Design a protein with these regions (language model features):
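ATP/NTP phosphate-donor binding region
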Residues: 1-98
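Solvent-exposed alpha-helices and their adjacent loops that cap or buttress functional pockets
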Residues: 11-12, 35-36, 91-94, 115, ...
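Short beta-strand/turn micro-motifs composed of small residues
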Residues: 44-45, 103, 160
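Residues that form or flank phosphate/diphosphate-binding pockets in enzymes
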Residues: 52-53, 109, 168
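A short, small-residue-rich loop immediately preceding and capping a beta-strand
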Residues: 92-128
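Buried hydrophobic packing segments
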Residues: 111-115, 180, 258
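A glycine/threonine-rich phosphate-anchoring loop and its flanking beta-alpha core
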Residues: 116-215
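Active-site segments that bind and position negatively charged phosphate/pyrophosphate groups
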Residues: 205-258
């Protein structure tokens, strides 16, 4: 199993999701799959994410002699709606696969939903440090032009290729940092709900969320420069706040009035 590389030494993580962040994400993914006897893969990406990471992942999988089917969703803007979900489900058929999501939020949500509904696992290969939803069980979808969240599953493992994350568009890096900044209000909202309406609350998880926020704000200059140190902090913070939601069983630790 690939180790969870954590910058937050005091974290109490109840969810056993192997997470790797570094320059050897694809070799680590291959090792993880070897150890887990995984040898059939459905690789889901869009044209951009396939070019920056998906093609390398496909080559590495084929080099092992494993079966891989690649689904490249093509459009200027891929949306997690019926059109793209059906494309993935048609490619998957009724066979057993390990799905691999190569992308950021939308690709991950499509893959999360489709893998869950076909009773398969999925692995996440993030391409941008833009959202905290990589570790989530929820899949925000657009159904009949209305946004809804379907309950699905977290990834079996996450392998974050640091050079790819550093090369992500700056607006996506900024979005990820904005997502982290929102935790200040989400924790305030959560505490207010606990005080006024006796909502369920967990102080340890709240502290974990705020520690992730503090670590990222302390390194804002490095994040703005898209340095490896800064982006490693940011993606780890996003993973950590996502895990806080997963561990608590609700989005309260990281989502509120913001």
């Amino acid at each position: 199993r690939s180790p969870r590389v954590s910058l937050f030494k005091e974290s109490i993580v109840q969810t056993d999701i192997p997470i790797y962040i570094g320059e050897k994400a694809i070799p680590e993914m291959i090792r993880y799959c070897q150890e887990g006897n995984r040898d059939r893969f459905l690789l889901v990406s869009d044209e951009n994410t396939h070019a920056v990471l998906g093609a390398r992942a496909e080559v590495a999988i084929r080099a092992q002699g494993w079966d891989v089917k690649t689904v490249v969703l093509s459009d200027e803007e891929v949306i997690a709606d019926e059109e793209y979900i059906v494309q993935v489900l048609l490619a998957a058929g009724r066979e057993e696969w390990t799905y691999v999501a190569v992308g950021s939020g939308t690709i991950t949500d499509i893959t999360r939903f489709c893998s869950h509904r076909t009773r398969n696992d999925f692995i996440s290969l993030p391409t941008a440090p833009s959202v905290d939803g990589y570790t989530s069980i929820g899949a925000p979808l657009v159904v009949r032009r209305v946004k809804t969240t379907a309950l699905a599953q977290p990834p079996a493992a996450i392998f974050a290729d640091l050079p790819t994350l550093c090369a992500a568009p700056r607006e996506m890096i900024a979005a990820g940092f904005g997502d982290i900044l929102g935790k200040s209000t989400s924790i305030a909202d959560w505490r207010l709900g606990a005080l006024l309406w006796d909502e369920p609350y967990d102080e340890k998880i709240a502290r974990r969320t705020l520690r992730a926020l503090q670590t990222c704000t302390d390194d804002v200059a490095e994040i703005a420069q898209a340095s490896e140190a800064g982006i490693a902090r940011l993606i780890e913070g996003l993973f950590e706040t996502g895990l806080c939601m997963l561990d608590f069983g609700q989005t309260r630790p990281a989502s509120g009035s913001e």
